[in-house]
């Protein structure tokens, strides 16, 4: 028996019949914990525990959770834990694929009808062989590669962190180029909690993805300059 928490996406037709399902614990790596260990533990579950605000979780604590039978909306790794926390699903009709936003992996991920990952828009840290090759390469406006390491990138490019609403902008996209808008909440940005909570910020961001070259360019962002006053750890718009 396998316990699951929001790690199966089910496609249902207008008559309520199941057409297909995407079992994320088989498609992705439910043991990638790089992001989960850096999240604010006061803002990871449906039942928010304010007493844990500002705290992170250790590898030992994650391992202990895996030994427990207390399944439910509990952050952690492994099938049955809240390791994916998918909060949006969009559809790309050009190749019959879905685009998911996985909050607890801090990644937008495109998955084909064949259940294979097409690309991953997120920090490369922690992705094992088979997934690492699918992580998009950031580039600047001239197409030159941008160096990224330990969750941080050179220049103005940034990944999204604990994001929501990764949506394809249909009127600007085609089969080769996908324009993606994302609400970047920003918790665990750069795979760490800042020294001061007031350093956190939320932003809206638009990316241009070249699906043939497997590159991503950041086209636009708003919110970074507004700072912590507009930071939203859980909510999206």
Over which residues does each language-model region extend?
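Beta-propeller domains
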Residues: 28, 55-200
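Short, ordered coil/turn segments that flank beta-strands lining enzyme active or ligand-binding pockets
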Residues: 14-15, 94, 113, 212
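Beta-propeller fold detector
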Residues: 19-27, 31-34, 118-133, 216-222
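Conserved small/polar residues in nucleotide/adenosyl-binding loops
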Residues: 235-237
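Internal, charge-rich low-complexity segments
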Residues: 29-51, 128-139
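Asp-box/WD-like beta-propeller blade repeats and closely related beta-sheet repeat scaffolds
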Residues: 1-43
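Beta-propeller blade signature
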Residues: 3-15, 196-211
């Amino acid at each position: 028996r396998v316990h699951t928490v929001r790690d199966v996406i089910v496609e249902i037709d207008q008559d309520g019949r199941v057409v297909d399902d995407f079992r994320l614990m088989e498609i992705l790596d439910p043991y990638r914990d790089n992001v989960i260990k850096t999240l604010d533990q006061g803002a990871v579950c449906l039942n928010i525990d304010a007493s844990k605000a500002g705290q992170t979780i250790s590898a030992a604590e994650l391992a202990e959770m895996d030994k427990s039978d207390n399944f439910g909306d509990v952050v952690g790794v492994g099938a049955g834990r809240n390791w994916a926390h998918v909060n949006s699903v969009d559809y790309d009709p050009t190749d019959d694929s879905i685009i998911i936003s996985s909050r607890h992996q801090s990644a937008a991920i495109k998955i084909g009808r064949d259940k294979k990952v097409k690309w991953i828009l997120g920090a490369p840290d922690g992705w094992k062989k088979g997934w690492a090759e699918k992580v998009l390469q950031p580039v600047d406006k001239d197409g030159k590669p941008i160096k990224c390491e330990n969750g941080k990138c050179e220049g103005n490019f940034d990944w999204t962190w604990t994001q929501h609403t990764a949506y394809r902008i249909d009127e600007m996209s085609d089969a080769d180029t996908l324009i993606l808008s994302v609400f970047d909440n920003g918790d665990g940005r750069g795979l760490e909690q800042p020294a001061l909570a007031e350093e956190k910020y939320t932003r809206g961001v638009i990316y241009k993805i070249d699906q043939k070259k497997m590159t991503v360019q950041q086209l636009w962002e708003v919110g970074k300059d507004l700072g912590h006053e507009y930071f939203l750890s859980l909510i999206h718009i």
